[in-house]
Amino acid sequence: MFRGASAINLDSKGRIAIPTRYRAEIIEQNAGQMVCTVDIRQPCLLLYPLKEWELVEQKLSALANFDLTHRSLQRVMLGYATECELDSAGRILISGPLRLHAKLEKSLMLVGQLNKFEIWSDAEWHAQIEQDMALGASGQFALSEELKMLSL
């Protein structure tokens, strides 16, 4: 399980170092194999351990591709999906098209989302968090039925 937000850097070759606390799980359960793709709703990337990605891939492939919305989702998420492997230094390479999509420069945030990570540019991450916090503080936060039952 991946939790927490980590400030990381993108090196000159387009690689990021996965924080040490996550590496053992990725290596033991996925042989260091991961898949990175775009988030269709946010200017960030989604980084999945291979086994988690395979579950997502099954769900995507089960969608009827005659439905234009389904087809668009498949095209974007599967089209950008790129396999990456942890190297001996715990780094993965983020492809150029993925870096461009998420506007990644040197300073990044790697954000654990339990079964996957989000990769954000530092500026986009902080702007998104400000927006999320403002929504929560506004009192206009629309709660779904599931959220109404959630106790934190």
From Swiss-Prot:
GO BP terms, alphabetized: negative regulation of DNA-templated transcription initiation
Q: Where in the cell is it found?
A: Cytoplasm, Nucleoid
Give every SpoVT-AbrB domain span.
5-52, 81-124
Keyword ATP-binding in annotation? no
Q: Offer an example of a GO molecular function term for this protein.
A: DNA-binding transcription factor activity
Keyword terms of this UniProt record: Cytoplasm, DNA-binding, Repeat, Transcription, Transcription regulation
Tell me which InterPro entries the record gives.
MraZ (IPR003444), MraZ_C (IPR035644), MraZ_dom (IPR020603), MraZ_N (IPR035642), MraZ_sf (IPR038619), SpoVT-AbrB_dom (IPR007159), SpoVT-AbrB_sf (IPR037914)
User: Which Gene3D superfamilies does its entry note?
Assistant: Transcriptional regulator MraZ domain
Asked if the record carries the keyword Repeat, the reply is yes
Q: Which cellular component appears as one GO term in the record?
A: nucleoid
Q: State the superkingdom.
A: Bacteria
PROSITE patterns in the record, alphabetically?
SPOVT_ABRB
What's this protein's family per the entry? Belongs to the MraZ family.
Protein name according to UniProt: Transcriptional regulator MraZ
Its source organism is Pasteurella multocida (strain Pm70)
